[in-house]
């Protein structure tokens, strides 16, 4: 194990290039302090100076504010790495290797923040690095030395690979090898990413030999620029001219934007890097267990806030001021929660957060350093049987069918009109109480695609999954019938591109509610790829720009990246859903939704509930506008044209994001949608005067 002052600390690290959006490689003291503040806010405790020594001031600030530093020498020959002429083996380059490592050590020797020396980056193994290792060990016997390219050889004290698969990490952690495993680069944070970060930290917390790693990387390395139309963008490779070689947006792998705005995936990092963990003991009685993961400090500097939520609404709250938990110790605590049986039939959630009593290390009093959400009583799915609504002393009038129109099947009720296009069987009009709930020309259609993320492009999913982009739907049946006073419309389709059948069923009651069931029956084809998502898509007029939902938030989240986002009731707008990743891609999804409302200023609109928690997104952008196609285009989020309506996606599930790398990795199997049978039911209910 790596020991710091005798303790086997966990390295909750990030790689940091010196980069500023306005001044390039010149980083001011103010910007450095901003970076350290953000690291503290998100529980990052270590930084690797990739791939060169930083400004001396950076080490001084790390000394002052408390960050572990891996001090890396300016030795990189990536371009020669995959040839037979690796500079690490050339005698003519021996002096250059050694002198750069000597200067790195000599200039930073007296900085207590430096706990590890790094010989360099991606230059290959060989005698030149062996000489550097021997010199450093003779010069400084107190600090370990690491070098990724040395692998398991003697001239690295730490096994510090890059982007090691989960399984390979576990295999090493279970082996008889004696060197600690600390990845010098892992969890490639490119674009909408960091899915599966939990799986890394499950292993790190399970195996003492696996002590963490350094995320690649801290900040998106783009500069502020204006395109030919005068639109301000963050520029990346290829934006400056067409003739210089570039790696496109491969410089944008950050946890934060160039302007130091946390990217949505940063919140997941902050959660799994936290050092106070809460576990349920008997939540019915308010009993929890606290584990202090810190190695050098107790919890006396913090207080605990707790909240009890019933179906997402705050019903009780309290504070515990004294937390006497020693480093690496556990303690049980009983919170003053009333009888939970008084909230019968409601989903009960217990939120706890740990906050600073006083300001420290650039953080304000009351800042939350750790949190947890625990289920006291589980969520119960709603009754999905749709029947006519009986009004007091008024006989309900069943909806009727008008099949006389040549283009549309029309369903009418006392206060609504619903139309289905006869040519394809899709819902095409939804008017309730005089209000059009679907955009003119829009339809409710099956959807299996998303705008590929950077990781999707790296795994070539835009090619591999291409068959799911608007697969051919050949309508084979279109019927309607009355059933218990409701109208049932059914449409069947052949899907020859994917060897499947699709069935869409709509049950409509007397108030204009619609239960939609999307069912796919897979054929026996063996080579149909996974899907990006399974769900439906529709367009609503732009007046329905308000979002009110009970699910995970407030930031976007995905099936393999939603542990930092708590369940609750959130009130947002459509404009807030789009996150401007430097290159346009999938964004804005929320998961584990119990209900979702799309409302106008008056609080009227549509409410969606499903047979199980579902996913949704609402954007002023189409999927097509965020999709670069078969190959990445030279595009930037501010250049994408918004539409004048709300594009709404309601999904049973969506593919996870992955994080092992951005050049082939895809989400863990449990976060994928393999070819097979799927069924998804949800109810669309017109609502009025809902408080936003």
Question: Positions of the model-derived regions?
Answer:
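Extracellular and select intracellular beta-sandwich modules with Ser/Thr-enriched
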Residues: 316-318, 367-372
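Extended substrate-binding grooves/exosites of carbohydrate-active enzymes
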Residues: 1-289, 294-300, 305-317
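Intrinsically disordered, low-complexity Pro/Gly/Ser/Thr-rich segments with frequent PxxP/GP/PP motifs
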Residues: 303, 309-345
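Short acidic/polar inter-strand loop motif in beta-rich domains
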Residues: 354-362
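A short acidic/small-residue loop/turn micro-motif
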Residues: 16-19, 322-324, 522
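Short linear motifs in exposed loops
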Residues: 12-13, 226, 318, 334, ...
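Beta-strand/loop-rich accessory regions of lumenal/periplasmic or secreted enzymes
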Residues: 336-345, 360, 374-692
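Exposed beta-strand face motif in extracellular beta-rich ectodomains
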Residues: 346-350
């Amino acid at each position: 194990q790596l020991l710091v002052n005798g303790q086997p600390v966990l390295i909750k690290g990030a790689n940091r290039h010196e980069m500023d959006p306005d001044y390039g490689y010149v980083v001011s003291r103010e910007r450095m302090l901003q970076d350290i503040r953000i690291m503290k806010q998100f529980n990052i405790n270590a930084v690797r100076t990739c791939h060169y020594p930083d400004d001396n001031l950076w080490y001084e600030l790390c000394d002052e504010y408390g960050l572990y530093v891996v001090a890396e020498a300016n030795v990189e020959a990536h371009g020669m790495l995959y040839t037979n002429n690796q500079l690490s083996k050339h005698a003519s380059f021996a002096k250059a290797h050694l002198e750069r490592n000597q200067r790195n050590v000599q200039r930073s020797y007296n900085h207590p923040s430096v706990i590890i020396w790094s010989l360099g980056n991606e230059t290959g193994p060989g005698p030149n690095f062996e000489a550097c290792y021997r010199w450093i060990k003779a010069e400084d016997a107190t600090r370990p030395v690491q070098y990724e390219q040395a692998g398991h050889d003697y001239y690295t004290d730490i096994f510090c690979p890059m982007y090691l698969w989960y399984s390979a990490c576990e295999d090493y952690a279970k082996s008889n090898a004696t060197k600690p495993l600390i990845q010098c680069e892992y969890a490639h944070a490119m674009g909408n990413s960091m899915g599966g970060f939990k799986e890394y930290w499950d292993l790190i917390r399970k195996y003492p030999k696996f002590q963490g790693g350094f995320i690649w990387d801290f900040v998106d390395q783009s500069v502020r620029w204006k395109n030919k139309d005068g639109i301000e963008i963050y520029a990346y490779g290829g934006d400056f001219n067409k003739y210089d070689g570039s790696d496109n947006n491969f410089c944008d792998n950050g946890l934060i934007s160039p302007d130091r705005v946390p990217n949505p995936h940063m919140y997941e990092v902050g959660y799994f890097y936290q050092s106070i963990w809460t576990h349920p003991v008997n939540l019915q009685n308010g009993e929890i267990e606290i584990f202090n993961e810190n190695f050098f400090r107790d919890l006396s500097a913090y207080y605990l806030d707790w909240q009890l939520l019933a179906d997402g609404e705050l019903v009780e709250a309290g504070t515990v001021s004294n937390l006497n938990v020693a480093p690496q110790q556990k303690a049980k605590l009983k919170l003053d929660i009333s009888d939970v049986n008084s909230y019968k039939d409601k989903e009960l959630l217990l939120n706890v957060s740990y906050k600073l009593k006083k300001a420290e290390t650039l953080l304000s009093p009351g800042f939350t350093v750790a949190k947890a959400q625990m289920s006291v009583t589980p969520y119960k799915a709603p009754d999905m049987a749709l029947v006519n609504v009986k009004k007091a002393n008024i006989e309900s009038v069943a909806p009727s069918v008008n099949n006389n129109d040549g283009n549309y099947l029309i369903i009418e009720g006392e206060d609504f009109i619903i139309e289905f296009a006869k040519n394809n069987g899709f819902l095409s009009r939804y008017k309730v109480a005089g209000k059009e709930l679907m955009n003119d020309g829009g339809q409710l259609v099956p959807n299996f695609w998303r705008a590929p993320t950077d990781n999707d492009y790296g795994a070539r999913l835009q090619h591999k999954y291409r068959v799911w982009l608007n697969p051919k739907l050949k309508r084979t049946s279109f019927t309607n019938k009355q059933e218990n006073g409701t109208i049932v419309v059914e449409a069947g389709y052949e899907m020859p591109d994917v060897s499947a059948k699709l069935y869409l069923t709509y049950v409509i009651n007397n108030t204009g509610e619609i239960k939609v069931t999307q069912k796919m029956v897979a054929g026996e084809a063996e080579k149909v790829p996974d899907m990006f998502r399974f769900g439906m898509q529709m367009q609503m007029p732009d007046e329905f720009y308000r979002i009110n939902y009970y699910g995970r938030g407030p930031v976007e989240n995905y099936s393999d990246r939603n542990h930092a986002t708590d369940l609750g009731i959130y009130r947002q707008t459509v404009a807030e859903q789009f996150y401007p990743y430097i290159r346009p891609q999938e964004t804005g999804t929320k998961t584990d939704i119990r209900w979702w409302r799309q409302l106008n200023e008056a609080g009227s609109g549509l409410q969606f509930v499903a047979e199980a928690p579902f996913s949704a997104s609402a954007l002023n952008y189409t999927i097509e506008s965020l999709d670069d196609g078969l190959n990445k285009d030279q595009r930037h989020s501010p250049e994408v044209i918004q539409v004048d309506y709300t594009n709404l996606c309601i999904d049973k599930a969506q593919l996870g994001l992955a994080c092992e790398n951005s050049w082939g990795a895809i989400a863990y199997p449990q976060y994928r949608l393999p070819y097979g049978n799927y069924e998804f039911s949800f109810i669309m209910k017109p609502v009025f005067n809902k408080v936003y």
